[in-house]
Amino acid sequence: MKKIVATGTFDILHPGHIYYLEESKKLGDELWVIVAREKNVVHKPRPIVSEDQRLKMIQSLKCVDHAVLGDQTDMYKPIREIDPAVITIGFNQKWSEEKLRADLAERNICADVVRISEYTGMPFTSSTKIIDEAVRRRTK
């Protein structure tokens, strides 16, 4: 069975997230999703939605076979435990594919890295766009 791992914060779930996960699922047989812990989100504003609620929403998606919260101290721990063939990253995730491949190799984790393209089928495909539009509408 070919396992795929997708990772993300998934704050304010939107069509871009669904596209990312559905495209990830197409690469294998079993999709595992690692949902970022609140304390580990340091590259952007803290999530609005709690980690438990974000996990529950991801678990409810048809394309997701398994979803877990990330480890609070070692982001590679769940990846080692899942042992995926492929790790996908979203088009706007800050990862460099080369750096991630090097980090995985350094830890003896044998997984390919695939960046999923941007979804452009709808206007609100990022949490930031949704928040900005909500603020704009509320402050008119």
Swiss-Prot record:
Family statement: Belongs to the archaeal FAD synthase family.
Keyword hit for DNA-binding: no
Function: Catalyzes the transfer of the AMP portion of ATP to flavin mononucleotide (FMN) to produce flavin adenine dinucleotide (FAD) coenzyme.
NCBIfam families: cyt_tran_rel
Pathway: Cofactor biosynthesis; FAD biosynthesis; FAD from FMN: step 1/1
GO molecular function: ATP binding; FMN adenylyltransferase activity
Enzymatic reactions: FMN + ATP + H(+) = FAD + diphosphate
EC category: transferase
Source organism of the structure: Methanocorpusculum labreanum (strain ATCC 43576 / DSM 4855 / Z)
Name used for this protein in its record: FAD synthase
Gene3D superfamilies to which the protein is assigned, alphabetical: HUPs
Gene name of the encoded protein: ribL
Gene Ontology biological process: FAD biosynthetic process; FMN metabolic process
Complex formation: Homodimer.
Statement: the UniProt record of this protein carries the keyword Flavoprotein: yes
InterPro entries: Archaeal_FAD_synthase, Cyt_trans-like, FAD_synth_RibL, Rossmann-like_a/b/a_fold
Residue sites binding ATP per the record: 9-10, 14-17, 92, 119
EC number of this enzyme: 2.7.7.2
Keywords: ATP-binding, FAD, Flavoprotein, FMN, Nucleotide-binding, Nucleotidyltransferase, Transferase
